[in-house]
Amino acid sequence: MSLMLEPNPTQIKEERIYAEMGLTDEEFAMVEKILGRLPNYTETGLFSVMWSEHCSYKNSKPVLRKFPTTGERVLQGPGEGAGIVDIGDNQAVVFKMESHNHPSAIEPYQGAATGVGGIIRDVFSMGARPVALLNSLRFGELQSPRVKYLFEEVVAGIAGYGNCIGIPTVGGEVQFDPCYEGNPLVNAMCVGLINHEDIKKGQAHGAGNTVMYVGASTGRDGIHGATFASEELSESSEAKRPAVQVGDPFMEKLLIEACLELIQSDALVGIQDMGAAGLTSSSAEMASKAGMGIEMYLDDVPQRETGMTPYEMMLSESQERMLIVVKKGREQEIVDLFEKYGLAAVTMGKVTEDKMLRLFHKGEMVAEVPADALAEEAPIYHKPSQEAAYFAEFQQMKMETPKVENYKETLFALLQQPTIASKEWVYDQYDYQVRTSTVVTPGSDAAVVRVRGTEKGLAMTTDCNSRYIYLDPEMGGKIAVAEAARNIVCSGGEPLAITDCLNFGNPEKPEIFWQIEKSVDGMSEACRTLQTPVIGGNVSMYNERSGEAVYPTPTVGMVGLVHDLKHVTTQEFKQAGDLVYVIGETKAEFGGSELQKMLHGKIFGQSPSIDLDVELKRQKQVLAAIQAGLVQSAHDVAEGGLAVAISESAIGANGLGATVKLDGEATAALFAESQSRFVITVKRENKEAFEKAVEAIQVGEVTNTNEVTIHNEENEVLLTANVDEMRKAWKGAIPCLLK
């Protein structure tokens, strides 16, 4: 009997065993007070994992409350598996993004794969069919062999899981900066579709109803994964490989189909994914949200390893498992349904009225804890916040324009920067056409997926320029949301809502907490102005290696509604003779830019600035022009500035180029990263109508010369670049670095 080895309650207290599990002295004293006695080993484990930052948001809740979370289309905000937004005709879109950073740092293939699996379960546990996946990835520089290994394995893991399960990976972003070398970021997003009447909640209602366990069996993988995600990575992290779970996408495919059939049955009361903290979080949260209790008999848990203790079963994060509550007396229907898919469905407990979570094993009660205490009563910490030392210094710097000798060489060098370069090497490994609903494939501003049976589409994107946020968290936070919305608009979509993944360093450091606060302030303001509420998300703290934090990276996942698929617009030029317009003014803004990083090897100074009211006005004008059929192509101006944006629009086309004239100082005109700018092409016959509808400046026209030529206001040629050569450089950059 392995139970003999577990320390008794007195030992747990005297030897401070709780501290190894992640509880502080004060927290352990709180547990003692809640229970009116010392907790046993299993109970200490339950509290340690439910009160971790990963599950309780105890360090970030005061900040998260600033987000606007309601709107006329919002059907479900934060608090359930995923958020839900109405898209009309009794349909809704369900989406969420989550991080799997720490597991991916030590076991990149499985870490990334199970990140994808977990976020898919969050979406179908709401009753939705998953229709698309996206991701947002950060790595160190590709010159490092370790980074190459992480990059290749993470991409393979995402591809391996998504392709097997048959959900298209349609978009995302990959950025490279030295600060991510020891701590990559892997954020996965899933989007699903649902009819209003099918929406399910993770709630355990109805005393006497049956608690069932469905899906894969439980092993020792991932024990304390949530706690592991709530501490900094160190050399000893390698030893925590067992805390990384192993995914089985074929099992999950069956689980999706079984659960979507289950949702049509009136026998189902509630359903929740066993994610972080496994059985503990699913049971405690479902009971707490319903104001009920749950009793569970752990001998009935399907186990794939022998001699598992209650502690191990409750804290395992084995994948592809769900906890469901069904009406009493209807259990056999559920067993039969899951059996049809070759899956186990086992009765393992019941709903009670007294709000307690009780666990039984081998005939004895092994834990008795108030469900609310686990799910709702974690301490909330108002961490000290202090402006980062570098901030004032950066703010006071006069922004100098970098010295550029040769504009053409600089453009080619920028196109080969891994953050700008083609990500085809990445997305060619993903099946982005499975389910045959993908209208706009990876590589344009946003992906678009058809809403079957309608003329509508969903536009989706992930965005975050972490460098801007490092330089100025509040301004950068605004830009992250605005850029996501700009990408949706350029694709013909109306921005609906966002999910976020807040990736930061250690919140116990006041300067890091300041970054969190300020970036959330900026994001919240942008969400209010652009009317894109936050409907759910995830916080990932402690992204540090050897005390060095990553850049603050609050990734934005946004979904927009394309009201009619004929509005779908992409970034590449369409035909020679079309007029090229630029919307928005260019300033000499180079802080955090690709050019600054490339020339100086570091970033400094002020980030670009943004006026959210101006941003909103421009987005509305562009979207109206697209919906009126006046726009041929649209592309947001981001990393690398106008020269890169115009080149990308040419690279995506076949045999087309452009002749363009840009005013102002040449380096800024070409490469500055000022916000709220678009490159738009318009048919000549629509010139008047377009200029009436949109404040834009005509800068040139699309040609069939296969060259991009840019002049200054004196009509001197700044650069002429062959589009085939640019395409070759842009497409070859990442494969070349990986060789």
UniProtKB/Swiss-Prot annotation:
Decide whether keyword Protein biosynthesis is in the record.
Answer: no
EC number(s) in its UniProt entry?
Answer: 6.3.5.3
Q: Which reaction does it catalyse?
A: N(2)-formyl-N(1)-(5-phospho-beta-D-ribosyl)glycinamide + L-glutamine + ATP + H2O = 2-formamido-N(1)-(5-O-phospho-beta-D-ribosyl)acetamidine + L-glutamate + ADP + phosphate + H(+)
GO MF annotation terms: ATP binding; magnesium ion binding; phosphoribosylformylglycinamidine synthase activity
Q: Which GO terms describe its cellular component?
A: cytoplasm
Residues annotated as binding Mg(2+) 2:
122, 273
> Which family does the UniProt entry place this protein in?
Belongs to the FGAMS family.
Name the record gives this protein: Phosphoribosylformylglycinamidine synthase subunit PurL
This chain's source organism reads Bacillus cereus (strain ATCC 10987 / NRS 248)
Q: Which gene encodes it?
A: purL
